[in-house]
């Protein structure tokens, strides 16, 4: 490709509304242009990268015998009404009407459409197992689209769905898909972690997320420093402290305190936050003989709402009471565990405390020297906190480390949630009608592009992994339009590289060398070859890798083989 025939629209300045590095660099490198909030046009440079992601994803899906299809982005409401999600889905679902006033929607996901297809086309166990995938545009009407294509309203996604008669068959496909995802991210040159995850609104049982590690990531990942264990923080088990709870040494004392913040309350008591408790009042499950229950944690720990919502005693969705006087008679900072009016669900770390401080269940009062059982009623020990760095790893090996991650893939074992609702089944070998069990496997194709930039950039621009770069090589001729010799050498090099199947950009613009170098470094082409008069005097060209290293003089006759070795 010649720059003179190419849409190369770089920016010198960073747009003011671009918050994270990938958004800034995608705009400056001319990869995307904003159309409206969360909506972007992909330019030729951006689309070249996007297509490279697509190609790797497609190859790995086909390698595990997944069959590609294409489903409509616009979906009829009646299918979503059949599954129950028309009413359950929130405002992220963009609902529209056609000219006949029939309800439709822009698809955020395609479980209903794929279920309808399989329901109509698959009737026998002999057609199973079956895995279908597509690479298709999705739309979710985010309340606050931000970070460019990282959290856009319209995005490109690969979604695959598998159908099985048995859980064992589903598990095999799930394992194959897990390995395929690992190969995809390895081929794309990304530093990633597969993590145990919550199934969320999609539903189902087993689930893994795939995260690209980056400081700008929205998700916290807990992983072991001594094993392959990794989990989303919301799913990582917080192990109970080892050993017996210490014996009581103090008597209970009451103190008058002031302030609404925990730190202000604890300071005059000379109590550290890890030696105090805090409480949350939440709505109880219907079968509990109380309208509310009290969740108790160590004061230095964070409540894990996903874990809390899964407790049998807690109503789902989790409802944390803000006006606590209604349930306890006191304001939130003064809720404690002595003479508690509600059932107590105590995190295991808090349950290991002795001689601790807590609210006195009287406004303006706190207690010190409190001990479980001696001073409290019955309680249940649960795991309801987020793990923190330094905790024992849930796998039993090493300590927990915490990193930020960008979710770029998610796989689920859906079970029969959708196939039951949509009546998707086949005749088994015995002639009996059997409901199918499903798997669901998503990759954020457009999000991968942004995540890769978050992981691969410097002060000059993007430093693409080889597999993702819009071009593999750029030829930068010095003053080509004034030197026939430079033009001839650059043209021949361009022709020879193309003949070898190398993806090359020939920067033949009438621009100053400084502008050309700045643009190419910003775009992030991995290999740069400079053709100039001085080096041609010695039958040489100059080579430099975008990721650094010394400039090298390469014999012009050896240039093609040298570039091939670098690739």
UniProtKB/Swiss-Prot annotation:
Which cysteines bridge via disulfide bonds? Answer: none
Task: Cite the Pfam families for this sequence.
Answer: HGTP_anticodon, tRNA-synt_2b, tRNA_edit
What UniProt keywords are attached to this protein's entry? Aminoacyl-tRNA synthetase, ATP-binding, Cytoplasm, Ligase, Nucleotide-binding, Protein biosynthesis
Q: Where in the cell is it found?
A: Cytoplasm
Sequence similarity: Belongs to the class-II aminoacyl-tRNA synthetase family. ProS type 1 subfamily.
Task of the protein: Catalyzes the attachment of proline to tRNA(Pro) in a two-step reaction: proline is first activated by ATP to form Pro-AMP and then transferred to the acceptor end of tRNA(Pro). As ProRS can inadvertently accommodate and process non-cognate amino acids such as alanine and cysteine, to avoid such errors it has two additional distinct editing activities against alanine. One activity is designated as 'pretransfer' editing and involves the tRNA(Pro)-independent hydrolysis of activated Ala-AMP.
Q: What is this protein called?
A: Proline--tRNA ligase
Q: Which organism is it from?
A: Idiomarina loihiensis (strain ATCC BAA-735 / DSM 15497 / L2-TR)
Tell me the gene name: proS
């Amino acid at each position: 490709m010649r720059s003179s025939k190419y849409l190369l629209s770089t920016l010198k300045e960073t747009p003011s509304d671009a918050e994270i590095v990938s958004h800034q660099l995608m705009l400056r490198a001319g990869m995307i242009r904003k159309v409206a909030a969360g909506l972007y046009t992909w330019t030729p440079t951006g689309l070249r990268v996007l297509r490279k992601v697509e190609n790797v994803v497609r190859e790995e899906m086909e390698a595990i015998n997944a069959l590609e299809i294409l489903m409509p982005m616009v979906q009829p409401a009646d299918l979503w009404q059949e599954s129950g999600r028309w009413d359950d889905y929130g405002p992220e679902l963009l609902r529209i009407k056609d000219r006949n006033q029939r309800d439709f929607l822009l698809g955020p996901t395609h479980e209903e459409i794929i279920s309808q297809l399989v329901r109509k086309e698959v009737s026998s166990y002999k057609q199973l197992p079956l895995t279908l995938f597509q690479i298709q545009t999705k739309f979710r009407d985010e309340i606050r689209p931000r970070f460019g294509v990282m959290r856009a309203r319209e995005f490109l996604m690969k979604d695959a769905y598998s159908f099985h008669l048995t859980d064992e068959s589903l598990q095999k496909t799930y394992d194959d898909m897990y390995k395929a995802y690992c190969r995809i991210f390895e081929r794309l040159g990304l530093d990633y972690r597969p993590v145990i995850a919550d199934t969320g609104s999609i539903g189902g049982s087993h689930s893994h997320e795939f995260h690209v590690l980056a400081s700008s990531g929205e998700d916290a990942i807990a992983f072991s420093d001594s094993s392959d264990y990794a989990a989303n923080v919301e799913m990582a088990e917080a192990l109970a402290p080892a050993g017996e709870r210490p014996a009581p040494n103090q008597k209970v004392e009451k103190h008058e305190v002031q302030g609404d913040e925990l730190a202000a309350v604890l300071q005059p008591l000379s109590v550290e936050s890890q030696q105090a408790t805090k409480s949350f009042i939440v709505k109880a499950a219907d079968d509990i003989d109380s309208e509310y229950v009290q969740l108790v944690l160590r004061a230095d720990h964070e409540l894990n709402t996903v874990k809390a919502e899964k407790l049998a005693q807690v109503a789902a969705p989790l409802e944390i009471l803000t006006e606590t006087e209604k349930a306890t008679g006191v304001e939130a900072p003064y809720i404690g565990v002595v003479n508690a009016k509600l059932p107590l669900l105590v995190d295991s770390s808090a349950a290991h405390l002795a001689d601790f401080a807590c609210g006195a269940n009287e406004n303006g009062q706190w207690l010190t020297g409190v001990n479980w059982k001696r001073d409290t009623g019955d309680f249940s020990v649960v795991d309801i906190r987020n793990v923190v760095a330094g905790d024992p790893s849930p796998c039993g090996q090493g300590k927990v480390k915490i990193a930020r991650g960008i979710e770029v893939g998610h796989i689920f074992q859906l079970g029969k949630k959708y196939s039951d609702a949509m009546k998707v089944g086949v005749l088994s070998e015995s002639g009996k009608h059997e409901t199918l069990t499903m798997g669901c496997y998503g990759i954020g194709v457009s999000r991968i592009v942004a995540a890769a930039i978050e992981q691969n950039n410097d002060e000059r621009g993007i430093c693409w992994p080889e597999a993702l770069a819009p071009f593999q090589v750029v030829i930068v001729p010095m003053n080509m339009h004034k030197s026939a010799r430079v033009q001839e050498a650059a043209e021949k090099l361009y022709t020879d590289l193309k003949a070898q199947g190398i993806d090359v950009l020939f920067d033949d613009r009438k621009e100053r060398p400084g502008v050309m170098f700045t643009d190419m470094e910003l775009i992030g082409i991995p290999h740069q070859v400079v053709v100039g008069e001085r080096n041609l005097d010695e039958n040489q060209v100059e080579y430099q890798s975008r990721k650094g290293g010394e400039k090298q003089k390469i014999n012009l006759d050896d240039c093609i083989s040298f570039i091939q070795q670098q690739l």
